[in-house]
Amino acid sequence: MAATYRLVVSTVNHYSSVVIDRRFEQAIHYCTGTCHTFTHGIDCIVVHHSVCADLLHIPVSQFKDADLNSMFLPHENGLSSAEGDYPQQAFTGIPRVKRGSTFQNTYNLKDIAGEAISFASGKIKEFSFEKLKNSNHAAYRKGRKVKSDSFNRRSVDLDLLCGHYNNDGNAPSFGLLRSSSVEEKPLSHRNSLDTNLTSMFLQNFSEEDLVTQILEKHKIDNFSSGTDIKMCLDILLKCSEDLKKCTDIIKQCIKKKSGSSISEGSGNDTISSSETVYMNVMTRLASYLKKLPFEFMQSGNNEALDLTELISNMPSLQLTPFSPVFGTEQPPKYEDVVQLSASDSGRFQTIELQNDKPNSRKMDTVQSIPNNSTNSLYNLEVNDPRTLKAVQVQSQSLTMNPLENVSSDDLMETLYIEEESDGKKALDKGQKTENGPSHELLKVNEHRAEFPEHATHLKKCPTPMQNEIGKIFEKSFVNLPKEDCKSKVSKFEEGDQRDFTNSSSQEEIDKLLMDLESFSQKMETSLREPLAKGKNSNFLNSHSQLTGQTLVDLEPKSKVSSPIEKVSPSCLTRIIETNGHKIEEEDRALLLRILESIEDFAQELVECKSSRGSLSQEKEMMQILQETLTTSSQANLSVCRSPVGDKAKDTTSAVLIQQTPEVIKIQNKPEKKPGTPLPPPATSPSSPRPLSPVPHVNNVVNAPLSINIPRFYFPEGLPDTCSNHEQTLSRIETAFMDIEEQKADIYEMGKIAKVCGCPLYWKAPMFRAAGGEKTGFVTAQSFIAMWRKLLNNHHDDASKFICLLAKPNCSSLEQEDFIPLLQDVVDTHPGLTFLKDAPEFHSRYITTVIQRIFYTVNRSWSGKITSTEIRKSNFLQTLALLEEEEDINQITDYFSYEHFYVIYCKFWELDTDHDLYISQADLSRYNDQASSSRIIERIFSGAVTRGKTIQKEGRMSYADFVWFLISEEDKRNPTSIEYWFRCMDVDGDGVLSMYELEYFYEEQCERMEAMGIEPLPFHDLLCQMLDLVKPAVDGKITLRDLKRCRMAHIFYDTFFNLEKYLDHEQRDPFAVQKDVENDGPEPSDWDRFAAEEYETLVAEESAQAQFQEGFEDYETDEPASPSEFGNKSNKILSASLPEKCGKLQSVDEE
């Protein structure tokens, strides 16, 4: 490095930028583009452009006489918080939030980037903002940045164009961190910076400056403009796809929430229900998040923005009213939702850093908040619901200010679960917005249990204070609607149960379960009462919920009143009062699962009330369950009321609830260490799971089934109740009227098939099923009678097709059943008209198509195709496609004549004596003896026969050769994988053992040594194959393993095809991986092979025809015209195969 330096202070983020200490004249400066810092005496080692403009003008006074390493803490998420001895943050006391929380300009990200990319690539002549101003996008959108390793420094172009920069050392930012001094300022009039900051930001640059910067960038770094454009387009495509998917999902959710809120709420409420407020907050969230503008480099305007002045001016902004509840059905913006989660995680990360030292310091910022902070708290909730947790806790600390023992820092820390990993507190980032409050309450109680001295002190607080607090909770609780009150009581009970002391006996656990059952019954009773019309605000609900939770836990004997019920202290609160023990984490998790089941049960009751849940259809079952719960609760009520005076024991009890709701097992487990982490709560299923009333095995209640299980298996297809069979039959009768004498031959049956709604080439099966094969025609009466019976008994295409084509009283298709259908295709399809002059080819083409059908469709290898196999295949769709496609070679599945031509030519080359059978020696000559002799022996041993067919010893028919050729050339096909697995499974146990693999690899080694190639030792090869296949059971490779690994073709070629094995060894491994990952509609290996071989065969035939034509011209000395030459060559090409064929046998003769 050329420049000398004395000190470098850096925070690493996505762009590897740094913060420079300007006390020194020279410093090593790392940046990501063309840098403008050369004039300041700072050397830059990377080409950079305008990223560090603001860094050169950071006030130096902030860094004097301070430990810069503690001021700038590098962090993975771009978070750095100044703690300990430095109460002020690095940038004028403002904390830095998660990267990406930057202020965007008013133009759309994709529009600006698209216009700029087009301008830079020369597609447009000028770049203007007028076009962007007239776009249909929203005026204020947050761009979404995609993080990619390959997009490290090239993405500066997008940031340059869109004003989207990192906060991590490049530009100052601020946010709503709970530990910062920002909250010391009045927050009562917070609002968005939509208009003011936007206009302020747009004054800092103009169109000419932006175009100039674009030109400078591409002049300096023009060699990579193509790469930049490609990466930009990739990112824009990804953003648009994600935006569309996320928008559709949000739109559906919002529409559902909006409908339920409007139907259940009151139209005269000035403040809607919590769901409505939630939706409004989601739509308006972007407007209320504070963002800082980033200034483009301007001459004379390089000073940083005074953040303190900006914050002081914020209270003057007025709060804009909420928009209607999605009257236009517009969901929240995708960027808003993403930004919300980003800022949330950043806020959590800072608290995580602060909580590393829970006992070393106390937060005093809460005490400086004014007492009249109710409005500010409400505004804060409206602006950002994620910050509600922190502010609510602070508000409660104000209410309990005389209680000096509980500090605000302790309350902040109660929001997290203690983990053992790394000795630090980890965050549960999987919390959902809807379930957030309930989980938060659980965590508050957990932490309060860890500090029992605070709770003890609070119990000793003055009685007037307790009464006042109880009134606050009672007042807010009374105003709740019934539905919301149910959820609040659920969370109160849930938090109360979490304080259950695990040192209690089995009897105490029974009492707890009884309380839960009683609570479920009370919730169900409350649902029968009319819903209250009075709705409270979202802040009141959440605030009263959290306040009541905290205060009721701290004062167990206080009573809570509500219009629904009086919640009296239960047995578990007495247990807490008596024992005062710390709750064991494992039993807490078990109880949490029980409580979540109760919540699911309550949710199902709500849906039952609104006729939306599954219980609304099973009211008889619900009645039985409720009677069981009521009886059990009354029977054990006296047990719950009995006082608890036992001391804590050394062992704790764990409750295990089985699927049978009558049995509960109690297991005693040794007490774990206090540091044992709490396991994550189990995810509750959507269906309700009623808990057991009492752990008595003899009280078994067998609930009878209230409804019959509906039929779900239809072997002949699902009946269509909407179809009108008589109307169809009348149309068929009318169609027969147009036919002479109302007698249709096989050619007229095409019209009848279309009237029946069937593909054209169903006409031959219909003709045969109606008895036309015997008489040569079909009458209207016979066909209508047959079709009426078919419609009544068969309801889908697969079952109808098998009924038409199969033998009488047969439910499956055999090979000979396809002959009439395929013969009709050969006779009538326009792509096979040339076969009329070569009838000897008909049987061979039909045989090939039949074998290809069974190869693909008959996955059971039974030799009989069932309706299930027809449904799973694409045969009926391909058959219907014959009607539309005139070129039959375009239908590569089953019917391609080119594929038949390739198969038969390959067979003809191996069949030296032309007896239509090939021997083992003949097959070994295929592809220059590429296949090993041992695998060929296995083929001729009968390992791959289908159904009841018997392998003729030492002979392979043409039908068997079709299976061999397709399997050899396409080892990725599922049938091919099973074909070769059967061959390699010598002992037939369904597993390829190491001995079988070694048996086949030995011959490969011998052949490689004969060629002068040193083979890989079997042990090393075996390790490679096991890594390739990754079998489920070590040392045993099954058919399922090979079908799952998607590399079966390499596995098989390694053991019995030397030529392809060597090709795989010499091929680029990255190309192999690319083939594996490519799931697009690529042609199969068989399609590629058939196309290449057909081109080769046609070229050979053409060369032979030209040679023969030249020889005839030499003898006659008469030149032939081009037309005569073309006609002769076509005749030779079409006649070449019949000359090879000789006398062909029919399918029946085989």
Swiss-Prot record:
Species this chain originates from: Homo sapiens
Disordered: annotated segments: 661-693, 1105-1132
Binding site for Ca(2+): D985, D987, D989, E996
Keyword tRNA-binding attached: no
Subunit structure: PP2A consists of a common heterodimeric core enzyme, composed of a 36 kDa catalytic subunit (subunit C) and a 65 kDa constant regulatory subunit (PR65 or subunit A), that associates with a variety of regulatory subunits. Proteins that associate with the core dimer include three families of regulatory subunits B (the R2/B/PR55/B55, R3/B''/PR72/PR130/PR59 and R5/B'/B56 families), the 48 kDa variable regulatory subunit, viral proteins, and cell signaling molecules.
Keyword Repeat part of the UniProt annotation: yes
Any one annotated GO CC term: protein phosphatase type 2A complex
Organism lineage string: Eukaryota, Metazoa, Chordata, Craniata, Vertebrata
Residue ranges of coiled coil: none
Pro residues compositional bias, start-end: 676-693
Tissues in which the UniProt entry reports expression: Expressed in heart, brain, placenta, lung, muscle and kidney.
Annotated GO biological process: eye photoreceptor cell differentiation; negative regulation of canonical Wnt signaling pathway; positive regulation of canonical Wnt signaling pathway; positive regulation of protein catabolic process; protein dephosphorylation; regulation of canonical Wnt signaling pathway; regulation of cell migration involved in somitogenic axis elongation; somatic muscle development
Gene3D superfamilies membership: 1.10.238.220, 1.10.238.230, EF-hand
One Gene Ontology molecular-function label: calcium ion binding
UniProt-recorded name of the protein: Serine/threonine-protein phosphatase 2A regulatory subunit B'' subunit alpha
Keywords of this entry: Calcium, Metal-binding, Repeat
Job of this protein: The B regulatory subunit might modulate substrate selectivity and catalytic activity, and might also direct the localization of the catalytic enzyme to a particular subcellular compartment.
